[in-house]
């Protein structure tokens, strides 16, 4: 009898201890889910909302476009060329910062999706080479990704000396809008 009574007593104590630990764990969990940090001021929050509205209203555009010495390594991380003159057979790199593209919101976050096309033209506007949707810039992030950089590289073998233009068009596949730019350049004989 004594053995059973002590088992029962131990079981009751175990249940009480489990209940106490469960309450403490729940309280700790509530604290862990509510981080303590300084929130932005109302002025900052209002400015961010105004920026968001301007971003959506302006539509797809570019805040930077330039030829570069090799591919960029991230947003704002590029070295612009000193001029737009390239040697025959040299890789031509460019950097662009698209803005105003749309986002698709889901439980995973905010998705953006852009596709780039290009056309190589001579000075009379004749298209020498072109390709649609040859590069894609896409991602999903918890916050709206507004610092998107696009590095594109081109190799035009056999292009004779002369003046040309490289036209790039970006298609916002979520916002159903397009924007582009045209960069003139010169090919000179290789040294």
Regions found by a protein language model. Name each.
Residues 28-32:
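Sec/Tat signal peptide C-region and signal peptidase I cleavage site
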Residues 11-16, 77-78:
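An N-terminal domain-start capping segment
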Residues 33-191:
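Intrinsically disordered, low-complexity terminal regions enriched in Ser/Thr/Pro/Gly
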Residues 14-27:
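Bacterial N-terminal signal peptides
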Residues 1-12:
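N-terminal secretory signal peptides that target proteins for export/translocation
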């Amino acid at each position: 009898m004594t053995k059973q009574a002590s088992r029962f007593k131990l079981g009751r104590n175990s249940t009480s201890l489990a209940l106490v630990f469960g309450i403490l764990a729940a309280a700790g969990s509530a604290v862990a889910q509510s981080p303590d940090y300084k929130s932005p001021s109302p002025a900052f929050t209002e400015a961010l909302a105004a920026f968001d509205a301007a971003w959506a209203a302006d539509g797809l555009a570019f805040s930077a476009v330039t030829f570069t010495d090799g591919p960029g390594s991230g947003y704002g991380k590029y070295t612009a060329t000193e001029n737009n003159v390239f040697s025959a057979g040299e890789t031509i790199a460019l950097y662009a910062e698209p803005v105003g593209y749309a986002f698709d919101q889901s439980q995973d976050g905010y998705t953006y999706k852009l596709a780039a096309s290009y056309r190589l033209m001579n000075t009379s506007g004749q298209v020498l080479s072109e390709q649609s949707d040859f590069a894609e810039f896409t991602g999903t992030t918890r916050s709206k990704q507004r610092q998107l950089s696009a590095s594109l590289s081109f190799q035009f073998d056999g292009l004779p000396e002369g003046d040309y233009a490289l036209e790039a068009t970006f298609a916002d596949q979520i916002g159903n809008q397009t924007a582009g730019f045209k960069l003139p350049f010169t090919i000179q004989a290789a040294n």
